[in-house]
């Protein structure tokens, strides 16, 4: 069974912090499985996720304070779940954030498979 946790940035969030976390979570060597990158953008594009989040923030005049939420869904070491199934479970969980921009990146480089969710703080509209 997966567990969910949220990452707290004790020194606060900056645009530099957000950009660094996005780069970390999308690393090819962490998200690759059988030639496929387990990276999905919901209401945003992975290739331009930083610009997408910042455009939304500027539009709503919310460019300071909490910039994003960072959630992690982890499966225990030895859990019989493959990376594709873990990513599908992560995408199903991300549907609960309908109307938000969400980046989902499933990491396969550890003994425990886990997915990172970077969620833009601002609700924009429901997905089509």
Which residues does each PLM region occupy?
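N-terminal nicking endonuclease/strand-transfer module with a His-rich metal-binding environment
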Residues: 1-125
């Amino acid at each position: 069974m997966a567990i969910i946790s949220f990452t707290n940035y004790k020194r606060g969030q900056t645009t530099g912090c957000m950009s660094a976390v996005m780069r970390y979570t999308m690393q090819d060597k962490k998200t690759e499985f059988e030639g496929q990158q387990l990276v999905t953008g919901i209401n945003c594009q992975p290739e331009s996720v930083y610009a997408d989040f910042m455009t939304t923030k500027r539009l709503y005049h919310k460019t300071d304070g909490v910039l994003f939420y960072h959630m992690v869904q982890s499966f225990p070491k030895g859990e019989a779940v493959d990376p594709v199934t873990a990513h599908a479970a992560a995408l199903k969980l991300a549907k609960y954030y309908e109307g938000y921009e969400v980046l989902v990146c499933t990491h396969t480089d550890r003994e425990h498979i886990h997915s990172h969710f970077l969620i833009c703080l601002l609700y924009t509209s429901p997905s089509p």
